């Protein structure tokens, strides 16, 4: 009996967590922003997809189609005659997804097409961290309730219906009714898993050696920056490689280091200043790892979630300034996941509490009184 009661409470809590209805609907805004950012970045890097139609013969041995490309039998590389039609399809569905025209099919097709692009990059040894997460978020949006808010589809649906009762403001009509929160919560889970696994990878593969700050030193002291003098080897491997591990390239290369693309002399100097003091760089390394390992704070409500999302934005801002890797998509997603109406509602209460505390210190015997009454200091 006790087990059944506990099970019911647990299921009730899960049901309330994922399926409670809320008017906080950031999914429509996320649907508008992410396809625009994603399509812009793809156009910046590939324009009309011609860069996906060849393999560099000099690096041919480093190119291996990913498991998904093999499983689905997708073309690799993309055939030249398909490049422009694929590009047109990609940018058109991105626009439809952002506008909310054929919203759910457009999001689904755009998400799958982005995964295909990510997989081509992975096959060439480059993992696109931004697009890999965003493509998953797009697929969630394609089925989650609330993602059609602020869309052309919703506007056309509203205009086609005969209004009954008092008319609502247009923005409220476009926002739509309260919807279950499971889509929003699922995106939070994806984001939490992304940050958490990043922290686990640092501990698993780097251990204490990562926490000593030497990896960050390599990134920030100019060793990985093409804008500073000297050679910048990007592919790395252990000093003593067993012969059986040299099968792919003859060297046993197993990973590569990130490049620091920051060309600003000012931010280069800031990076040098940080790395010049071992304590600073160690604090940065430890703080970043602990922050990522605490990612499941995103599943909590209230200030823990808000503070973590703000911390994530700050972390990406720092990486953007120091390495010119701003992860704009992540920053936008974190910003839009914050319930700013809740934050605004909480801040005045905090300010009032602070004022009351200060008043008690300044005026002995001060007591707050209800609104409409006369304040009395005894």
Task: Label each residue range with its predicted role.
Residues 1-378:
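Alpha-helical membrane-anchoring segments
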């Amino acid at each position: 009996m006790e087990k059944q009661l506990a099970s019911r409470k647990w299921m009730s809590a899960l049901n309330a967590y994922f399926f409670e209805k809320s008017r906080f609907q950031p999914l429509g805004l996320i649907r508008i922003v992410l396809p625009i950012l994603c399509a812009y970045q793809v156009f910046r890097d590939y324009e009309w997809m011609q860069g996906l139609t060849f393999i560099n013969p000099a690096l041919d041995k480093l190119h291996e189609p990913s498991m998904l490309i093999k499983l689905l039998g997708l073309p690799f590389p993309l055939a030249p005659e398909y490049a422009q039609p694929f590009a047109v399809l990609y940018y058109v569905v991105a626009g439809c997804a952002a506008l909310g025209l054929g919203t759910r099919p457009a999001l689904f097709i755009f998400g799958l097409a982005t995964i295909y692009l990510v997989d081509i990059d992975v096959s060439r040894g480059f993992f696109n961290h931004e697009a890999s997460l965003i493509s998953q978020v797009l697929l969630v949006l394609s089925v989650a309730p609330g993602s059609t808010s602020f869309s052309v589809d919703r506007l056309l649906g509203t205009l086609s219906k005969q209004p009954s009762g008092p008319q609502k403001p247009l923005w409220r009509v476009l926002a739509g009714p309260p919807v279950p929160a499971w889509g929003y919560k699922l995106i939070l889970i994806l984001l939490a898993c992304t940050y958490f696994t990043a922290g686990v990878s640092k501990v698993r593969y780097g251990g204490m050696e990562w926490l000593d700050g030497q990896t960050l030193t390599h990134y920030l002291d100019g060793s990985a920056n093409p804008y500073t003098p000297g050679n910048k080897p990007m592919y790395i491997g252990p000093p003593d490689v067993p012969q059986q591990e040299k099968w792919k390239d003859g060297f046993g290369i197993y990973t590569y280091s990130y490049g620091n693309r920051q060309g600003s002399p000012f931010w280069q100097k800031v990076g040098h200043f940080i790395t010049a003091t071992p304590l600073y760089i160690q604090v940065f390394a430890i703080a970043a790892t602990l922050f990522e390992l605490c990612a499941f704070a995103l599943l909590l409500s209230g200030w823990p979630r808000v503070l973590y999302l703000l911390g994530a934005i700050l972390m990406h801002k720092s990486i953007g300034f120091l390495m010119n890797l701003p992860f704009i998509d992540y920053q936008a997603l974190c910003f839009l996941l914050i319930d700013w109406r809740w934050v605004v509602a909480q801040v005045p209460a905090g300010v009032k509490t602070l004022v009351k505390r200060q008043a008690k210190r300044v005026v002995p015997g001060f007591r707050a009184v209800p609104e409409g009454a006369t304040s009395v200091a005894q």
